[in-house]
């Protein structure tokens, strides 16, 4: 039913009014008479029905019958705002028009109209006139004129007025009949539509109540699941905190191990330098001992020929004292060497223990990540179920809103960024695999982490809006019963008018009861919708909060994963560096030091006498007594000067297990039954020591080039590659480091590569030493 109102009036024929069905019944004017006194105070009584909401700017005006808009008022008064007004209630109000505002007696018809602040006319009264009171018989005057004729005053005026009123009455009666017929038809249609709307609303309310009950039950179940997930999340957070604490402890231990490694490196460097120096001293002392022994033998042979026996005895005693001191120094050097080997073994044991603790930490982190992934999967399943159930409860919900589209776009962007991060992680992971193939367990855990990184932890939220049906409350217009103007017509139509009024009152009461019931149902529906909206908001807030917590947890786990990767890489680098240094130290320690003989030297019985010269050549004239001990066990043999300059072995022996254990120094002397090919040693003149040999095995020549360095302190050292000359007293270790800097050395087999060698070839060679097992060096080149 339309809520607009139109009032039309025809100016001709005494101002007859044609009114259509409108909203004029929203304000009902009461006790409106047929006429009022002009220039006198006028009371206006009206009732505000529940279909109108009063406003302080509403007003009541006096309009001439035939007005066309709200601006055609004669005068008006503001409608007072009722006190303690309740929406939907009926209010009775009264206003008084002062006498100087009331129109004069002009024979026109007027009516009250209620105008809202928006300019809509929501109520109109029956027409009335402003005229003086009807004169009685006593008020009639008889006037005698010159023709002695009596003239009745006001008779003609009254007769004319009576004719106009009768004509207006006929028009109003016809209009009333038409309006009554039209009203009956509209009432029937309205009643039918109200019944249909009521039944539809009731069925809709029942359906919504059932849906609300189902949603409430499901919300309780989801709340229970959320509580379980919160408990699991709390456990994961506690485990994460413990892992963080453990990681912090590991970092502290790593720093401590770093400091220990640095101190051990410094100590090893110092011990290596001392060992080289002691080896050089020992070699010099060995040569000196041989010289003294030869001199002693010569002196014994000349003792019979020289009378100065006392001087010879003194020289012999001094030589024996020097020999004893040399033996003591050799014993001290052996003790220091054993201490250095024990320190190396302790350092390797600590490094292995650090590796085991790192593996345990990685296992704990993998378990925590698996629990996080399981909790995230449960949360995703719960969100999908909630979105599907909310979609079914929403009924005919339209397409997703713009907010959904924006959220979907953000989710796609997050997925793209996650994929890019996963690709970057894959590259880093492949690089780590190339550098460390021997750690199988760590590889499997990293592959599991790679699979977890591709998982999408972003879910799409669906916003459902329940649209409440707009129950269009129909409005009714009940035109007031037109009363008769003349007393004679009023008496004849009195009974019919009373019956019509009773019928109108009954219909109005029925309509009001139906409207009140509909209003009550509408109010209940609004309350239910409010409750549903509140439940949806609570559920959405809870899901958002849980999502935020899960995202924070994921970020923290990612940070822990990144820090663990950094720690792992740092530890691998330290392990490789320490392994290279340990391998280098082990190769240096494998060169056995000369052993002092326990038994006297087997001198020849009849050597030719030789004169004593001030500077005896370094080479023994009777041969090296140690070369005759080749048939002895390799453990008791000593190194010849040729053997001392041999390069270290290409690779350490294979280890039986991953445990770093202390290995005894290996003897480089040949086994029993084999002959060690000797090479001629050129002798130098004028007291020069024999030149250093350049022994290289055939295998060494095929694989790489090794250098033998002259350790004599009185010879200028020259780099064989860059031809840089160093002073005689330049440190031997610094000179060796300078020569080795021209090459890239394999950290496992010490094979040398030129600096311009391709990186891929160098890495391929290094990788060939590993087969994926920890500390397995069986596949050395």
Curated annotation (Swiss-Prot):
The record, for Pfam families, names: CALCOCO1 (PF07888), SKICH (PF17751), Zn-C2H2_12 (PF18112)
Annotated positions binding Zn(2+) 1: 719, 722, 738, 742
Composition bias, Pro residues: 646-656
Q: Which Gene3D superfamilies match?
A: 2.60.40.2840, 6.20.250.40
Give the binding site residues for Zn(2+) 2. 746, 749, 765, 769
UBZ1-type zinc finger positions in the chain?
716-742, 743-769
Q: Which domain of life is it from?
A: Eukaryota
GO MF terms listed in the record are:
zinc ion binding
Q: From the UniProt record, list the coiled-coil ranges.
A: 148-453, 488-581
What protein am I looking at? Tax1-binding protein 1 homolog A
């Amino acid at each position: 039913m339309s809520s607009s109102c139109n009032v039309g009036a025809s100016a001709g024929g005494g101002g007859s009014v044609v009114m259509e069905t409108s909203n004029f019944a929203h304000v009902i004017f009461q006790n409106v008479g047929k006429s009022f006194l002009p220039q006198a105070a006028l009371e206006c009584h009206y009732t505000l029905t529940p279909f109108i909401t009063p406003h302080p700017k509403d007003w009541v005006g006096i309009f001439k019958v035939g007005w066309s808009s709200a601006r055609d008022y004669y005068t008006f008064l503001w409608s007072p705002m009722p006190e303690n007004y309740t929406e939907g209630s009926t209010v009775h109000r009264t206003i008084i028009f002062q006498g100087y505002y009331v129109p004069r007696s002009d024979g026109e018809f007027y009516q009250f109209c209620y105008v809202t602040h928006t300019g809509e006319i929501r109520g109109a009264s029956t027409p009335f006139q402003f005229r003086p009171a009807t004169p009685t018989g006593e008020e009639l005057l008889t006037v005698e004129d010159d023709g002695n004729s009596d003239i009745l005053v006001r008779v003609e005026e009254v007769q004319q007025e009576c004719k106009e009123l009768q004509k207006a009455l006929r028009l109003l009666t016809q209009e009333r009949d038409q309006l009554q017929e039209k009203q009956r038809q509209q009432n029937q249609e309205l009643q039918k539509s109200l019944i249909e709307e009521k039944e539809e609303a009731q069925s809709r309310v029942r359906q919504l109540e059932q849906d609300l009950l189902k949603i409430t039950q499901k919300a309780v179940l989801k709340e229970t699941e959320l509580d379980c997930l919160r408990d699991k999340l709390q456990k994961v957070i506690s485990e994460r905190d413990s892992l963080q604490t453990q990681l912090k402890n590991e970092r502290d231990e790593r720093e401590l191990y770093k400091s220990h490694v640095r101190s051990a490196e410094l100590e090893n460097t110092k011990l290596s330098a001392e060992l080289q120096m002691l080896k050089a001293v020992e070699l010099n002392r060995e040569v000196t001992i041989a010289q003294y022994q030869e001199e002693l033998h010569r002196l014994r042979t000349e003792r019979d020929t020289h009378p100065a026996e006392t001087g010879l005895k003194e020289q012999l005693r001094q030589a024996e004292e020097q020999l004893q001191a040399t033996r003591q120094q050799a014993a001290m050097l052996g003790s220091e060497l054993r201490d250095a080997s024990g320190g190396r073994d302790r350092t390797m044991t600590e490094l292995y223990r650090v590796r085991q603790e790192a593996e345990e930490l990685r296992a704990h982190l993998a378990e925590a990540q698996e629990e996080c992934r399981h909790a995230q999967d449960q949360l995703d399943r719960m969100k999908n179920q909630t979105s599907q159930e909310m979609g079914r409860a929403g009924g005919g919900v339209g397409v997703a809103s713009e907010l959904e589209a924006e959220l979907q776009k953000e989710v796609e962007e997050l997925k793209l960024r996650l994929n890019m991060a996963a690709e970057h992680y894959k590259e880093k992971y492949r690089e780590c695999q190339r550098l460390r193939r021997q750690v199988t367990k760590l590889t499997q855990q990293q592959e599991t982490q790679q699979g977890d990184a591709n998982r999408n932890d972003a879910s799409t939220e669906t916003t459902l809006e329940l649209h409440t049906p707009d129950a269009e409350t129909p409005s009714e217009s009940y035109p007031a019963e037109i009363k008769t103007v003349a007393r004679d017509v009023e008496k004849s139509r009195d009974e019919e008018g009373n019956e019509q009024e009773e019928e109108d009152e009954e219909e109005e009461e029925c309509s009001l009861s139906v409207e009140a019931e509909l209003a009550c149902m509408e109010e209940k529906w609004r309350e239910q919708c409010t409750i549903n909206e509140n439940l949806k908001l609570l559920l959405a807030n809870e899901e958002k909060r849980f999502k935020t917590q899960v995202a924070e947890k994921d970020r923290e786990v990612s940070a822990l994963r990144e820090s663990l990767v950094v720690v792992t890489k740092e530890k691998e680098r330290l392990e490789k560096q320490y392994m290279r240094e340990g391998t280098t130290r082990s190769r240096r320690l494998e060169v056995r030091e000369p052993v002092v003989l326990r038994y006297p030297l087997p001198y020849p019985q009849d050597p030719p006498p030789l004169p004593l010269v001030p500077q005896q050549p370094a080479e023994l004239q009777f041969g090296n007594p140690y070369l005759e001990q080749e048939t002895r066990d390799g453990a008791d043999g000593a190194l010849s000067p040729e053997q001392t300059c041999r390069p270290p072995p290409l690779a350490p022996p294979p280890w039986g297990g991953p445990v770093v254990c202390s290995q005894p120094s290996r003897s480089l002397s040949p086994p029993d039954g084999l002959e060690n090919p000797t090479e001629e040693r050129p002798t130098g003149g004028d007291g020069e020591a024999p030149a250093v040999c350049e022994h290289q095995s055939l295998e060494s020549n095929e694989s790489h080039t090794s250098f033998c360095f002259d350790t004599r302190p009185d010879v200028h050292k020259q780099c064989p590659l860059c031809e840089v000359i160093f002073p005689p007293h330049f440190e031997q270790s610094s000179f060796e480091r300078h020569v080795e800097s021209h090459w890239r050395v394999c950290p496992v087999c010490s094979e040398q590569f030129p600096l311009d060698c391709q990186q891929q070839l160098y890495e391929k060679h290094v990788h060939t030493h590993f087969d994926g097992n920890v500390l397995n060096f069986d596949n050395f080149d």
